Amino acid sequence: MSERPSSLSFERIADRYDATRGGEQRGRRTAANLASLLDPAAPVMEVGIGTGIVALGLRELGFTVLGVDLSPAMAQRARRRLGPVVAVADAAQLPVADATIQQAVSVWLLHLVADRAVVLAEVARALRSGGRYLCTAWGRVPPRDEVERLLFDMRNQLDPTGGWRDDERQVLDAARSAGFTVVDQRVASLGEVPQSPAEVADKIEEKPWSYLWDLTDAQWRAVVAPTVAALRALPDAHLQRRYDMPLRIIVLQRR
């Protein structure tokens, strides 16, 4: 697989990905929400398998899972969990023949790829007619409090196009053009995440999220540093708040 310059690999964060993304617990919760939408008798390909936390959850529920990831280091960690069923490959160049996959899933992938329309078309190529593709989208959900508002505004300043939000409408339009029918859309819960504003500020400075990786010093000073300062200046900044983590699932079927 050739890595295109605009494709985003998580190679640099593979060693701390699980610790910053909820690990196997969140993977199991995600898998539980996907399971009822999949055929337990058919293998599942996870496109963008990462370290395998969701795939592990699906396997524990009785599914046969295989997957691909752009990052060799992430794929290596997935193999430790799942065995030799993980390949290094680009979501835009899947290493499978036409119409050979029965069902596929992608969790938190489409906002990271160079061109979601290309990836959706590639998954459609690989799926059999009638096969399902479950994917997730961030959507356009308004911030629920001042912490989320500060994060929302920061991301909008860093990406004024709003592409990071992975708007459902954009995903659905691209999916239909790729040969999919929209079967279902739903919002599930991955449970509550306790965090204080100060903890969020600390996490930002650790740069765990991909949109923080390649900022210039000027961007950091102009956008990120003021956000960190504002988070720490909130009243009771060291008191934890509880946030429900939504999982917005789109169910597509290959025509």
Question: What are these regions, as identified by a protein language model?
Answer:
Residues M1-A42, I53-G57, M74-R77, R132-G163, ...:
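Conserved class I S-adenosyl-L-methionine
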Residues M45-V47, T51-Q93:
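Class I SAM-dependent methyltransferase SAM/SAH-binding core
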Residues T51, D166, T181-R255:
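Conserved Class I S-adenosyl-L-methionine
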Residues V105:
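A conserved beta-strand element that flanks and buttresses the S-adenosyl-L-methionine
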Residues W108-L112:
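Short catalytic micro-motifs in class I SAM-dependent methyltransferases
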Residues A117-S129:
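A short glycine-rich, Lys/Arg-flanked "PGG" loop and its adjoining helix->strand segment in the class I
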Residues G163-A178:
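Short alpha-helix
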